[in-house]
Regions:
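Basic, amphipathic "hinge/linker" alpha-helix immediately C-terminal to the N-terminal HTH DNA-binding motif
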Residues: 66-84
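Short, hydrophobic-biased segments on the C-terminal half of alpha helices
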Residues: 42-49
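Beta-hairpin "wing" of winged helix-turn-helix
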Residues: 51-66, 71
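Amphipathic alpha-helical dimerization/coiled-coil segments
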Residues: 78-102
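Short, well-ordered turn and helix-capping elements at secondary-structure junctions
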Residues: 28, 32, 58-60, 74-76
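N-terminal helix-turn-helix DNA-binding core of bacterial DNA-binding proteins
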Residues: 1-42
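Short, charged/polar surface micro-motifs in flexible loops or helix N-caps
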Residues: 16-20, 50-51, 76
Length: 102
């Protein structure tokens, strides 16, 4: 059931604009996702790229080596929309269960 939550969150971060891996981790941490590491997001990014949900391009960095920047594809935008719908249903059900005093 919880499978795909991090993927959905990554899609949401990428949907805000072109971004690279470490920047995604920082953005997730800013929203309370302190358990996310490079080791957890890079395999997901690779899989999402293979599934054509995202694309990447290497760009020069002012602070060192080139960085791989990710953007959403139209398929990725649709997957994000689908994720948001699934999340809304799931969170509504969990909230109802948790607030039920019986």
């Amino acid at each position: 059931m919880l499978k795909g939550i991090l993927e959905g969150c990554l899609l949401a971060v990428i949907s805000k604009g072109e971004t690279y891996g470490y920047e995604m981790i920082e953005k997730l941490e800013a929203h309370g996702f302190h358990m996310v590491s490079e080791g957890s997001i890079y395999p997901l990014l690779l899989r999402m790229q293979k599934e054509q949900l995202i694309t990447s391009i290497m760009k020069a960095s002012p602070n060192g080596p080139k960085r791989k920047y990710y953007t959403l594809t139209p398929k990725g935008q649709q997957e994000l929309k689908d994720f948001q719908e699934r999340w809304n249903l799931l969170s509504h059900s969990v909230n109802q269960l948790m607030n039920n005093k019986k």
